[in-house]
Amino acid sequence: VLLVRDIQGEGLEVFLIERAAKTNFGGAYVFPGGKVDLEDSSGRLSDMCQGVSDEDASSALGIDKGGLAYWVAVIRECFEEAGILLAYRKDGNNFDPEDEAENERFIEFRKRLNEGEPVLAEMCKSEELFLATDRLAYLAHWITPKVEKRRYDTRFFIAQAPEGQEAIHDGSESVNSIWIKPEDALKQFEEGKLLMIMPTIKNLEDICGYNNTKELLEDKNSINPYDIATIEPKFFMKDGKYVGLLPGEEGYDDH
């Protein structure tokens, strides 16, 4: 999930986490995220989602059913890896811990989720929350190239960070985190100061040039999801080095 927020003046920032050395893509700066868990598709959680049905979500992703689980997974992973919970209270207001006692309860819920406990539905029920699935914009679909030993089928989403919550990495799978303008992140990558992988780079390029998060989300939500193509890079050896190509680039269909 590309977690974004407005900055003073014009423009926006995106939240990046540095992967721990022991994990896949160790040392790289990536977006928070992970796999869809079994609980994400539970009926209990479906009833706790605001504004998006499984039919709508599945249609957007081009699958028969189960699409809403991706929206739920985005919110869960955002909470696990960034400490940001995209949710509404029962009165319709955005969730924001009211006091230290409530904040401590949610720190404990996050800890349990990071330990693998399927407690998202329990948390929503006990705290009377609804997941803000209507505040996500579906952005991109990437598949890991065939040369990789581990392959992933990944959907990317955009979400606006709510005011009043502070994003922070989990200290386990991620060891550092930054808020940074997408243009600055790309510049630091070019200068060798920030390690990033191709999907991160290309998705950052896709959110450059927007004046604020409202403009970004409105633009991405206006795109017909059927027009979001699946991107599967191809890598091949040239002069002793791997060269990567994307669909539509010259030479892609030759490999």
Named regions from a protein language model:
Residues 1-255:
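N-terminal leader/linker segments that precede catalytic domains of diphosphate-processing enzymes
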